[in-house]
Amino acid sequence: MKRLAPRVNVIPVIGRADTLTPHELAESKKLVMEDIEHYRIPVYNFPYDIEEDDEDTVEENAELRGLMPFAIVGSEDIIEIGGRKVRARQYPWGVVEVDNPRHSDFLAIRSALLHSHLADLKEIVHDFLYENYRTEKLSKSVDGTTGGYVMFYQVL
C-alpha cells in the first residue's frame, strides 16, 4: 500500500469479510488501521471541514471514516429472499447479502466511490497524484537518469 499511495487513492478494504466472526472482523479492522498509522500509509480519509461543510457532509464522511477499512462481501449469485432478488452467498447456516449493511460495507463504499466522492477522488488523482508522478518522471529525464529503464531512440 505504501508503494501505491503516491500513485493512486488508497482505500483499505477487507475482502471476504463474511469468513470472519464479528469479533475477528472488529479486531482485523483495528489492526489494519493501527498498521496504516504506524507505517504512515497515506489513505483517502474522506476529508471534511466542520466549519465549511454542511452537517450532512460532515456526518457522512465521519461515518465513512469509522467504517475503514471497509468490510466487503461479494457474490455473483442471485438468491430470492422474501420475494425479492438479492446478490448473496448461501451457507448452511444462512445467507449473507452483499447489499445488506449489517453484513457488508459494500453499499457505503459503492455510494462513496461512484457518487458522493467521485469528483473529489478524480480531482486528487489529476491535480495531486498525477502531477507528482509527472514531475518525478520529468525531473528524472532532465538529469539524465531513467529510473532503471533503458531508453532506445530511433533516428529517422
Model-derived segments and their meaning:
Residues P6-L156:
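Conserved GTP-binding G-domain of TRAFAC-class P-loop NTPases and closely related GTPase folds
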